[in-house]
């Protein structure tokens, strides 16, 4: 009888714990992307929303990205309006979340990924203001020697 009473009393506590633990575990599992951007840049904020909607947690620094880009080893010629760091890899510009997931899964020997400039149609540059316009662009794998190669093309 005492065992049954104990189980009846413990059941609500266990049920509550299971409903709160799952979302916390999911948040803990989301890869964290640390981002440096201009505080007034709207397309950067749209890229952050794109990452959040695709399984990433984000921490944003609105202090500009030039110093972060240099510190993380992204060549200036591959620069864009924001810089990120995830899993030891640098991200420069409007890199699609799909390619970031792929990068983390494949773990290539590289500095990270870059989408130079601000191509219309890339994540963060795809809002209503751009209509249906989609410019072709490449996601580049940035190598330690400063070189790069095409990681994924968007046409």
What are the residue ranges of the model-derived segments?
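Local sequence-structure signature of Cys/Sec-based thiol-disulfide redox active-site neighborhoods
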Residues: 31-46
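Thiol/selenol-based redox catalytic cores and closely related redox-interacting motifs
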Residues: 71-155
């Amino acid at each position: 009888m005492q065992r049954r009473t104990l189980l009846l009393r413990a059941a609500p506590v266990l049920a509550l714990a299971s409903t709160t633990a799952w979302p916390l575990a999911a948040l803990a599992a989301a890869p964290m992307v640390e981002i440096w951007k201009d505080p007034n840049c709207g397309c950067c904020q749209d890229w952050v929303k794109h990452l959040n909607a695709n399984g990433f947690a984000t921490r944003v620094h609105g202090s500009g990205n030039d110093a972060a880009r240099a510190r993380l080893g992204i060549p200036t010629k591959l620069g864009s309006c924001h810089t990120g760091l995830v899993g030891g890899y640098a991200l420069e510009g409007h890199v699609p979340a799909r390619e970031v997931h792929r990068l983390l899964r494949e773990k290539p020997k590289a500095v990270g990924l870059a989408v130079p400039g601000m191509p219309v149609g890339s994540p963060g540059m795809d809002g209503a203001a751009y209509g249906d316009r989609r410019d072709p662009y490449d996601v580049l794998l940035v190598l330690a020697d400063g070189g790069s190669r095409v990681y994924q093309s968007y046409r």
